[in-house]
Amino acid sequence: MCDVVLGSQWGDEGKGKLVDLLCDDIDVCARCAGGNNAGHTIVVDKTKYDFHMLPSGLVNPNCKNLVGSGVVIHVPSFFQELENLEAKGLDCRDRLFVSSRAHLVFDFHQRTDKLKEAELSTNKKAIGTTGKGIGPTYSTKASRSGIRVHHLVNPDPAAWEDFKTRYMRLVESRQKRYGQFDYDYEEELARYEKYRETLRPFVVDSVVFMHDAIAANKKILVEGANALMLDIDFGTYPYVTSSSTGIGGVLTGLGIPPRTIKNVYGVVKAYTTRVGEGPFPTEQLNEVGETLQDVGAEYGVTTGRKRRCGWLDLVVLKYSNAINGYTSLNITKLDVLDKFKEIEVGVAYKLNGKELPSFPEDLIDLAKVEVVYKKFPGWEQDITGISKYEDLPENAKNYLKFIEEYLGVPIQWVGTGPARESMLEKKI
């Protein structure tokens, strides 16, 4: 059976920390979507490990790790991330596997990603992309012109000729669209000819890999990337990523049936953040937002960009839960709220004076909503490292209880600090 960890807001909720905790007792950790456009840091024995594309289960020496078919892979970044982990003492090459069906991100995808964003910014419609080429790669995938891992690693000499033909078609189509931008495609092709050999040992048929693990009754953890509000279908479109980041992406990104999923853990930051553009109803462009940003160290692992900050939005979480069906929640970074005398939570949206029955799909409406807040007294004490739920201040427990009751989902874990061990588990 599979347990799944998913982001419930706009990303950066702290999924990696929960995955790290759960990985102590699993056999397989799998990534199902996204690429190296997201990131998180895991601290083990005072050593920091930065993850972007690779599964966090690599920190567990007994865990096998799969980069699934729904992930898009920039091969140079794949090896760079692997080398960075190895430089910090992780021996993980024989525990890392890549789906033969995953699509490849090329440097020209990254170039055109930035060119497209520059075009949009002139009309003040920029998405806020990371520039990692993720969107253009999913675009070529959807148009059936993309290149998959098996196209690269097939040892048949004819396969390499086919790869080069596919590659040049993509380059030429981008040059027609954006002009003769500065790009040495021959140099990239030469690099990928070498990657044919170096990537091949990692490549597996991920459908067989996953179904063999399921048949053997292995404990499997699926690590979601990004979050529901960045989902290509259900997020704040077009200010989203280009993949399915919810429970649907788990099924399509790994090729597993719904009945194999046992638990869906929703990771929720105790307040709200987002990176990039797009409406953000509970955003606080004031001292509150600045405090959350500073105390929470809200800077992106991948881009270094400051994250926009605001109060917890339960309208977003109710919508997120309706789609993903969380069995329990992990509330992270509760300690960031320690110094607030008063804490607010968004509980409803009003548009033109009328309360909306659900989260609006139209961003024109979303940008105009008035948030209805419920105020809570803060606990105004340091909760860092508290390991028992019973030891939390009453006001903190009241805050958490309200979240549970509003969503109808139990809270199973609470993050009380940045350290790996600063995560208490609550009986549910």
From Swiss-Prot:
Active site residues per record: D12, H40
Keywords on record: Cytoplasm, GTP-binding, Ligase, Magnesium, Metal-binding, Nucleotide-binding, Purine biosynthesis
PROSITE patterns reported in the protein's UniProt record: ADENYLOSUCCIN_SYN_1 (PS01266), ADENYLOSUCCIN_SYN_2 (PS00513)
Enzyme class: ligase
Gene3D superfamilies: Adenylosuccinate Synthetase, subunit A, domain 1, Adenylosuccinate Synthetase, subunit A, domain 2, Adenylosuccinate Synthetase, subunit A, domain 3
Residues given in the record as IMP binding sites: D12, E13, G14, K15, N37, A38, G39, H40, T130, R144, N226, T241, R305
Molecular function in Gene Ontology: adenylosuccinate synthase activity; GTP binding; magnesium ion binding
Pathway membership, UniProt: Purine metabolism; AMP biosynthesis via de novo pathway; AMP from IMP: step 1/2
Keyword Kinase: no
Cofactor(s) demanded: Mg(2+)
Chief location of this protein within or outside the cell: cytoplasm
UniProt KW tRNA processing keyword: no
Binding site for substrate: V301, T302, T303, G304, R305, K306, R307
InterPro entries assigned: Adenylosuccin_syn_GTP-bd (IPR018220), Adenylosuccin_syn_Lys_AS (IPR033128), Adenylosuccinate_synth_dom1 (IPR042109), Adenylosuccinate_synth_dom2 (IPR042110), Adenylosuccinate_synth_dom3 (IPR042111), Adenylosuccinate_synthetase (IPR001114), P-loop_NTPase (IPR027417)
One Gene Ontology biological process: IMP metabolic process
Residues reported in the UniProt entry to bind GTP: 11-17, 39-41, 307, 333-335, 415-417
HAMAP family given in the database record: Adenylosucc_synth
Function as written in the Swiss-Prot or TrEMBL entry: Plays an important role in the de novo pathway and in the salvage pathway of purine nucleotide biosynthesis. Catalyzes the first committed step in the biosynthesis of AMP from IMP.
Protein name: Adenylosuccinate synthetase
Source organism of the structure: Candida tropicalis (strain ATCC MYA-3404 / T1)
